């Protein structure tokens, strides 16, 4: 019923806000994250439609988006919240964060190809398969491909999930990764969801795509949850970018070792995997951990957890 839905969202929202309010506000970054989160909570009071959440990298976009979705779902009695991302690596990271705050796995359905199954018996497996077929869980974490399949594919399995999109909150993360040739079709889908299905759509990104100058633009206005503030973005400018393309891999390895004597972290972007592999072979004696996205998800998750426990 509507009352039960509202109570469920209220409980989840209260739990989430309590955890968010427990965060420290000592540093400028902490203060900026809290301001972004509070703005998301306030914006959730607005009526449904299409929203834009543009937050600097490191601004707590996942948790702020979760707060908006829960608050909006509570006020307008939405059936479910659907979190989508075009990239599996981002989806896995977001899923872990969302689970920490929802704190009830029975309310969450993850639907993507990288999922590690944890069902202990056939009954649990049957229940999960049914939820995957119907998308009737309160919180769904999935890929943008799965969402678009429901809208555009004629497969029975996709059509069976269609009703679950109605009267929901759909948060689309890293929306800038949608290929430019697909933006027009994507905008048509967003318009249909918002205008026909009663869906509140949230487009999340630090670098929003241009959806106004295409053949089928998103019908406006798209409301900004967090107004653009140059001072806010300046707080999150924590990187120093250097081009080392003229160096050999051996020179880059030496550069990295020397740089890490003065900084806490360093990211090296290579064009090819074999370059990354060779670079790691030059650095592996320096006690650097190896995380390969070519490995299965379970291995990389365990490796990351092990590394975190060592750091602690």
Residue spans of the language-model regions?
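N-terminal accessory nucleic-acid engagement/regulatory domains that precede
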Residues: 1-22
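Walker A/P-loop
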Residues: 48-68
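Conserved Walker A/P-loop ATP-binding site and its immediately adjacent core
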Residues: 80-100
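Conserved strand-helix element at the start of the C-terminal RecA-like helicase core
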Residues: 88-90, 262-282
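Inter-Walker segment of RecA-like/P-loop motor cores
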Residues: 106-149
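SF2 helicase catalytic motif II
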Residues: 161-185
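Interdomain hinge/linker at the junction between the two RecA-like core domains of SF2 helicases
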Residues: 209-255
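Conserved small/polar residues in nucleotide/adenosyl-binding loops
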Residues: 299-306
